[in-house]
Amino acid sequence: MFGSYEKTLDSKNRLVIPSKFRDELGETFYITLGFEKSLEFRSKKSFEEFSNKISSNNLLDSKMRELSRYIFANTIEVSSDKLGRVIILDNLLKKAEIEKDAVIVGVGNKAELWSKEKFEKITNIYENEENIKKLTQELFEKGAVL
């Protein structure tokens, strides 16, 4: 998935999922609280792969159990209605600091939902070409492949 779309949640916390994202996510998919106060949307297949990666770690390690608890306790399964809307639980919206205006962003095999204000803050840093070069260099030094 790729691209970004500005969206507004209605009074019932319903969000219209862009049709291109609906095609990839399917009618029923998973929403998880992300690490940077965003919500992550994954298809059933993608969530199963994600879940298996987490479960394949050493669950004897207390930190891994904490992370597993955090992820799975903050995940819901949702189904879209005929208009492509999903209801997002209030507790997840509060944790992600999303009130009404939001941006949904395609990020490869998942989509992320951000508050519009937070998304603008984090993306404004990269309007400067030097910041993008610095980020790219740091990632290459860590072994990233683009």
From Swiss-Prot:
<dbReference type="InterPro" id="IPR020603">
    <property type="entry name" value="MraZ_dom"/>
</dbReference>
<keyword id="KW-0238">DNA-binding</keyword>
<dbReference type="InterPro" id="IPR035642">
    <property type="entry name" value="MraZ_N"/>
</dbReference>
<keyword id="KW-0804">Transcription</keyword>
<dbReference type="GO" id="GO:2000143">
    <property type="term" value="P:negative regulation of DNA-templated transcription initiation"/>
</dbReference>
<dbReference type="InterPro" id="IPR037914">
    <property type="entry name" value="SpoVT-AbrB_sf"/>
</dbReference>
<feature type="domain" description="SpoVT-AbrB 1">
    <location>
        <begin position="4"/>
        <end position="46"/>
    </location>
</feature>
<keyword id="KW-0677">Repeat</keyword>
<dbReference type="GO" id="GO:0003700">
    <property type="term" value="F:DNA-binding transcription factor activity"/>
</dbReference>
<dbReference type="GO" id="GO:0000976">
    <property type="term" value="F:transcription cis-regulatory region binding"/>
</dbReference>
<feature type="domain" description="SpoVT-AbrB 2">
    <location>
        <begin position="75"/>
        <end position="118"/>
    </location>
</feature>
<dbReference type="InterPro" id="IPR038619">
    <property type="entry name" value="MraZ_sf"/>
</dbReference>
<dbReference type="Pfam" id="PF02381">
    <property type="entry name" value="MraZ"/>
</dbReference>
<dbReference type="InterPro" id="IPR035644">
    <property type="entry name" value="MraZ_C"/>
</dbReference>
<comment type="similarity">
    <text>Belongs to the MraZ family.</text>
</comment>
<comment type="subunit">
    <text>Forms oligomers.</text>
</comment>
<protein>
    <recommendedName>
        <fullName>Transcriptional regulator MraZ</fullName>
    </recommendedName>
</protein>
<dbReference type="InterPro" id="IPR003444">
    <property type="entry name" value="MraZ"/>
</dbReference>
<keyword id="KW-0963">Cytoplasm</keyword>
<dbReference type="InterPro" id="IPR007159">
    <property type="entry name" value="SpoVT-AbrB_dom"/>
</dbReference>
<dbReference type="GO" id="GO:0009295">
    <property type="term" value="C:nucleoid"/>
</dbReference>
<keyword id="KW-0805">Transcription regulation</keyword>
<dbReference type="GO" id="GO:0005737">
    <property type="term" value="C:cytoplasm"/>
</dbReference>
